[in-house]
Amino acid sequence: MRSISLTWTDEIGDDEVIVFVSTVQKAIQIAWEQLPKEGTLVPPPEIKPFGNWVLENADPEMDYASFQWYLDSALDRETDSLHTDRFLELVLREPWQQRAPHYDLSLVHMPLHDGKGRSISGLAVRGRAAILSVHRLRSLQDNWLALIALRRLTMHYVGQMLAVPIPDVRGTMDCQAVCVMRPADTLARLIAYSEQEINAGTSYCEQCRLEMGQRLVGSHFGNN
C-alpha cells in the first residue's frame, strides 16, 4: 500500500494543521471502510505527517534536501505566488518517489497559480500528488467557516490525489452529486458547497466512496 506524505509550511497555524491532518485521516478511513470487512488483504495506508521537513545532516539549500527547497524552486518572484505545476513536477521527480512510490499532499499559506497564470486554491496530479493553500480562506472573517472550508478543500484534494472520480466509470472527471468532489473554483462556491454538504450530513457521495476504495486496492496491487 502506498503511504501518504503530508507536508505544510511553518506559517500554517496549529488549528489549520489539526484540521488538515485529521481530515486526511478521516478521508482515508472512509476509503478503507469500503473494502470487505472480512478476508481483506489490503491494510490501511500509513499517513506520514512530515510538516516542514529538512533532511538530517544535509544543506537545506541542496536539491531535494528540504521542503523549503521545493517552495523556493517553484516560487514566482514577480507575483510572490507558487507555480503549482512546477511544484508538483518537483514532487514527482524526487529520488525517493522513484524508489518507493507514495502519495504526496501539501498545504501552504501562499497564493497559488497554475500553468496559465490563473489564481487557484489547489491543484492535483491525479493518482499521485496534490497541493492546496489557505491563502484565500484567510480572507474570511469567520475562523470557524475558514476551517470548515479547509476541511472541504482537503477532502476534495485527497480524492483528486487518489484519482477520484474515475472517468471510465462515470464518463466525467467531476462529481455531480452533493459531494466534496464537486469542483469549487471560487471561494464563494467553496463556502456554499461546504454548508450544503454539512446540512445534508455528507462528505463523499456513495459512488465516490466506492471508487476511493477501488483506488486503494489498485495502489496496493500496483494498478494505480
Each model region followed by its residue ranges:
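Propeptide-to-catalytic entry region of secreted or membrane-anchored zinc metalloproteases
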Residues: 1-114
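Residue-level recognition of short, structured coil/turn motifs
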Residues: 29, 33-37, 146, 163, ...
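Metalloprotease/metallohydrolase-associated module, dominated by Zn2+-dependent proteases
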Residues: 127-144, 165-224
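A structure-centric signal for secondary-structure junctions around beta-strands
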Residues: 1-3, 101, 126, 175-178
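Active-site-proximal segment of zinc-dependent metalloprotease catalytic domains
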Residues: 93-166
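Low-complexity, polar-biased intrinsically disordered regions enriched in Pro/Ser/Thr/Gly
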Residues: 61-66, 119, 169-170
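Glycine-rich, flexible loop segments associated with nucleotide phosphate handling
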Residues: 78-81, 146-150, 175-178
